[in-house]
């Protein structure tokens, strides 16, 4: 496996840290008045999702993670597992509920998403940045209720709850940002 020196660190680089694959979120080079230069690195553990900060002296190396990111199409959910397919090779992947995390609230059949594989096992699913979902349940908007800039909660067809403007009704299709869980606009 490839080893990376501290001076090769950049955001997005995948490394093995404490036995788990991690991605560099932020790399800060610190040059104190006295002493040796060091790097303060913020990592995101790709398995647990936790963020941790470590410092490294110049000259240290870390092993690169054998991580692949594939663009897969979501096929269906059978209750316990989620099924995806690579459109190039037609290879299918089965992912359990625990690995899906928050992504399951944003995926509609036939959507494309990014699946991260480590040692040929799926470890995370990243939905597209924006998805179009249908409103299944929400309170009716009251005419003339425009005093505030507030919204109302709406349950989407995937089960996720999103704050939407007062004019959105049941059956409407809305665009949702999956990174922030915010309403973007009508679809």
From Swiss-Prot:
Pathway: Protein biosynthesis; polypeptide chain elongation. The modification N6-(3,6-diaminohexanoyl)-5-hydroxylysine is found at residue 34. Keywords: Cytoplasm, Elongation factor, Hydroxylation, Protein biosynthesis. It holds the Pfam family EFP_N. GO terms for biological process: peptide biosynthetic process. GO terms for molecular function: translation elongation factor activity. CDD domains: S1_EF-P_repeat_1, S1_EF-P_repeat_2. It comes from the Bacteria. One of its GO terms (cellular component) is cytoplasm. It is found in: Cytoplasm. May be beta-lysylated on the epsilon-amino group of Lys-34 by the combined action of EpmA and EpmB, and then hydroxylated on the C5 position of the same residue by EpmC (if this protein is present). Lysylation is critical for the stimulatory effect of EF-P on peptide-bond formation. The lysylation moiety may extend toward the peptidyltransferase center and stabilize the terminal 3-CCA end of the tRNA. Hydroxylation of the C5 position on Lys-34 may allow additional potential stabilizing hydrogen-bond interactions with the P-tRNA. Disulfide bonds: none annotated. Involved in peptide bond synthesis. Alleviates ribosome stalling that occurs when 3 or more consecutive Pro residues or the sequence PPG is present in a protein, possibly by augmenting the peptidyl transferase activity of the ribosome. Modification of Lys-34 is required for alleviation. NCBIfam families: efp, PRK00529.1. PANTHER family: ELONGATION FACTOR P, ELONGATION FACTOR P (EF-P) FAMILY PROTEIN. Belongs to the elongation factor P family. This is Elongation factor P. It comes from Ruthia magnifica subsp. Calyptogena magnifica.
